[in-house]
Amino acid sequence: MFKMFKTKQTKELYAPVTGTTISLEQVPDQVFAQKMMGDGIAFELESNVICAPCDGKIAMVANTLHAVGINADNGAEILIHIGLDTVNLGGKGFTQLVQVGDKVTKGTPMIEVDMDFMKEQNIVLTTPMVITNSADFNFDVEDGEKHVIMGEDKVITFK
């Protein structure tokens, strides 16, 4: 009877992009490789859309549009950083599809990437997704390199 009062809790994070998974340790940026921002996973980006990996609320969109933060329904704070050194582009090559405060569900498009522009600028599109408050959670991260589909494949499971 009381199940109707339970709130839905995020149990998994799904791939926010289509691409190949890599461990954070393989990211050629020490801030992510040494997990200074939190634990998680990274992707070699193939798709031009970054989508929500779970249900939650948009907490932050960087002024330069290279990063987006989500507060998941279970309290996890998720940061998706699109590419490396993309902050230097000043927002060029990105289209914002969500606003701070928007409620999102798994698969909601958040940022669109101009892949041709990124190639012209020689931008590395390795895209880390970290749980910035990862010390507060127990979770398993998919290991090994594997091809994932945006919004379909689980990459992190909370215990």
What are these regions (language model features)?
Residues 1-159:
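Contiguous, well-folded functional domains in the mature portion of proteins
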